[in-house]
């Protein structure tokens, strides 16, 4: 469950290390974001000489959440951290590598490029 002001780890090689959610996209009543949701975020920590800089406003897709997520088969999945991957406004990843596992729900949301770059899909 990601809401405005939530901090997330960045799980790609764009150079950003930590982002803060500004808005969960998808309607005026869409208060909380879960796996596969698109958010607008601000870069809070970044590496020097990176593609993104501290203070940049970026789009990101949530790939892992600490809060458990109920799947249609009745099982639950949760991760050790809240993580996101930076994307373009069209939904294509900005980085060329993704670190750590991502949830299978990204396939249902049609983020196939993120799925193909990820080392593990849970």
Swiss-Prot record:
Main function: Binds to 23S rRNA. Forms part of two intersubunit bridges in the 70S ribosome.
Gene3D superfamilies recorded: Ribosomal protein L14
GO MF term (any one): large ribosomal subunit rRNA binding
Keyword Ribosomal protein set for record: yes
Record InterPro entries: Ribosomal_uL14 (IPR000218), Ribosomal_uL14_bac-type (IPR005745), Ribosomal_uL14_CS (IPR019972), Ribosomal_uL14_sf (IPR036853)
Gene coding for it: rplN
Family according to the record: Belongs to the universal ribosomal protein uL14 family.
Name this protein carries in UniProt: Large ribosomal subunit protein uL14
A Gene Ontology cellular-component term: cytosolic large ribosomal subunit
Species assigned in the record: Thermomicrobium roseum (strain ATCC 27502 / DSM 5159 / P-2)
PANTHER family: 50S/60S RIBOSOMAL PROTEIN L14/L23, LARGE RIBOSOMAL SUBUNIT PROTEIN UL14M
Keyword line: Ribonucleoprotein, Ribosomal protein, RNA-binding, rRNA-binding
């Amino acid at each position: 469950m990601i809401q405005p002001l939530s901090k997330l780890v960045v799980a790609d090689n764009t150079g950003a290390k930590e982002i803060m959610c500004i808005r969960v996209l998808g309607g005026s009543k869409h208060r909380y974001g879960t796996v596969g949701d698109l958010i607008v975020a601000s870069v809070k920590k970044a590496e020097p000489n990176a593609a993104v800089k501290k203070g940049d406003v970026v789009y990101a897709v949530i790939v892992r959440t600490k809060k458990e997520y109920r799947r249609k088969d009745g099982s639950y999945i949760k991760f050790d951290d809240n993580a996101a991957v930076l994307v373009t406004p069209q939904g294509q990843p900005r980085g060329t590598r993704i670190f750590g596992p991502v949830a299978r729900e990204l396939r249902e949301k049609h983020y196939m490029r993120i799925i193909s770059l990820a080392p593990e899909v849970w």
